[in-house]
């Protein structure tokens, strides 16, 4: 049975490095990659008052497309089997739920490969809040790709 690796991708330099590492590792291990970009839900009183559901969904898709520009080409060129998807919500919760849901599929996620820090400058020192949460979730092994020094 082939392995499946989940790669959270937020467009940060660390996420790009982790994706490149995951692509190389998937080629070596003949694994499948699931690249997941997670957009905010915008479920606030102000957002619901000012925007309708369709506007919010269109904006999330726009952010997804901007963030993942070039990702699909890199995945196609890798020769690895892959999927590129968008999730919506809190990244920690979406990642845990994605791993758990995959257990009921033909391609359960064996490993999360992610950068040590993402795009949020307010949380985390050496290790970002999402990376830290994934390690502590215990849903599956996590490989952290360190940021450039």
Predicted regions and their residues:
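Intrinsically disordered or low-complexity boundary/linker segments at protein termini
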Residues: 1-17, 78, 106-110, 137-149
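Small/aliphatic-rich secondary-structure junction motif
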Residues: 3-53, 78
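Histidine-centered beta-alpha loop that forms part of the nucleotide-sugar donor binding/catalytic region
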Residues: 10, 89, 116-119, 147-148
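General small-molecule cofactor/ligand-binding pocket signal
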Residues: 36, 83-87, 143
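A short acidic, glycine-rich active-site loop
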Residues: 52-66
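Structural beta-alpha unit
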Residues: 73-112, 149
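Glycine-rich, Arg-bearing micro-motifs that act as flexible, cationic patches
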Residues: 111-133, 137
């Amino acid at each position: 049975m082939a392995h499946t690796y989940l790669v959270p991708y937020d467009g940060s330099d660390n996420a790009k490095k982790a994706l490149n590492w995951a692509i190389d590792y998937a080629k070596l291990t003949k694994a499948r990659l699931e690249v997941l970009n997670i957009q905010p839900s915008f479920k606030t009183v102000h957002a619901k008052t000012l925007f309708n559901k369709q506007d919010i969904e269109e904006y999330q898709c726009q952010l997804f497309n901007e963030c993942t520009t070039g990702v699909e080409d890199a995945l196609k060129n890798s020769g690895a089997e892959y999927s590129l998807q968008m999730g919506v919500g809190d990244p920690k919760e979406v990642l845990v739920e994605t791993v758990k849901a995959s257990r009921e599929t033909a391609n359960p996620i064996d490993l999360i490969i992610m950068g040590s820090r993402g795009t949020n400058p307010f949380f985390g020192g050496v290790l970002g809040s999402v990376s830290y949460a994934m390690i502590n979730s215990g849903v599956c092994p996590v490989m952290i790709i360190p940021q450039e020094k």
